[in-house]
Regions:
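Short loop/edge segments at beta-strand edges and connector loops
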Residues: 54, 205, 230
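Canonical Radical SAM [4Fe-4S] cluster-binding loop centered on the CxxxCxxC motif
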Residues: 1-3, 255
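Radical SAM/AdoMet-radical enzyme domain recognition
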Residues: 3-23, 31-144
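Radical SAM enzyme [4Fe-4S]-AdoMet core and its adjacent flexible, acidic
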Residues: 84-87, 92-225
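A sequence-level detector of short linear motifs
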Residues: 225-227, 253
Length: 305
């Protein structure tokens, strides 16, 4: 989709009460002019704020422009602090790039800086180590249950030989690799106690700004919080108020469903009534409960997480 097409779609969506936007991917900062797009979307009547989800590697270059464009919140994906595991899972960049991106986001004064970590049993992650990013800085770490998005057992050619087995382990979803939130919270809390940070306590104040489903906890004395998103063990479909517009112009009412409503042909035909019809159909057909065990054909990078 062109920026003009995205802008026209958001203008129509704003007429239905859409107020909050998130730019995601894939990697949104790989799209030339991402900050310009954010600025154009913020200028649309009715839009109140824009957030972005990124792998963080390009944030040192673009954080200033994004903040100036009106982006208020940033989520940074970081699943591990182990360099070898990071290389095997991400296949590009380095942990240092991401950490510099986190620093850049804080320096530019984004209202909320969050780190998203997908908890995967096969990765044997240092969960408490990741939460320590928020010990002295207002970084909010959220742990997300591993979900069946996409289905690919093919090992890309650029994976180092020593990392190929690990990539294969985490590229094809296996229910046994999903760590339920109750178990994960216990793991994080007990690790905090062993490290002298004390147990996790329910977060009754200082919760980060946002409109998502995370339940927040914190370690006493930490500036940041620890959130848990229970997409698998305790779905929150009845509270879901999100629609996803894919890069190829399809409106998706549920992350876990392959049901999509094309809007790009109508946008290119300047048929706003057809766009509205697709939007209304997507709203009507948001499922009461996702069927996450079925998986999806598209990858998260194609849908927008």
């Amino acid at each position: 989709m062109s920026f003009e097409e995205i802008e026209r779609f958001v203008s129509i969506a704003a007429g239905y009460g859409i107020r909050h936007l998130r730019l995601t991917g894939g990697e949104p900062l790989a799209r030339k002019g991402c900050a310009e797009l954010a600025s154009r979307l913020m200028a649309i009547d009715g839009i109140e704020d824009i957030a972005i989800t990124t792998n963080g590697a390009l944030l040192p270059r673009f954080a200033h422009d994004l903040r100036a464009a009106g982006v208020s919140r940033v989520n940074i994906s970081l699943d591990t602090l182990d360099p070898a595991k990071f290389a095997a899972v991400t296949r590009v960049g380095s942990i240092d790039d991401v950490l510099r991106g986190i620093d850049a986001a804080l320096e530019e004064g984004f209202e909320t800086v969050k780190v998203n970590t997908v908890a995967v049993r096969a990765l044997d992650q240092d969960f408490f180590g990741i939460t320590e990013l928020g010990r002295d800085r207002p970084i909010h770490v959220r742990f997300i249950e591993y979900m069946p998005i996409g289905d690919d057992e093919t090992i890309p050619k650029n994976i180092p030989e020593e990392g190929s087995a690990l990539f294969k382990d985490v590229s094809a979803w296996d229910r046994s690799d999903t760590i339920p939130t109750d178990e994960l919270r216990r793991i994080v809390s007990e690790a905090g106690e062993r490290a002298g940070a004390g147990p996790l306590i329910a977060c009754t104040k200082d919760r980060p700004e946002g409109h998502g489903p995370a339940q927040y906890w914190k370690f006493e004395g930490f500036k940041g919080t620890v959130g848990f998103i229970s997409a698998m063990s305790s779905h929150f479909c009845s509270q879901c108020n999100r629609l996803r517009l894919t890069a190829d112009g399809n409106l998706r009412p549920c992350l876990f469903s392959d049901l999509e409503y094309p809007v790009l042909p109508a946008l290119r035909a300047h048929d706003d009534d057809a766009v509205r019809a697709a939007f209304e159909a997507a709203l009507r057909n948001k499922p009461d409960k996702h069927k996450s065990n079925d998986g999806t054909e598209r990858f998260m990078s194609q849908i927008g997480g």
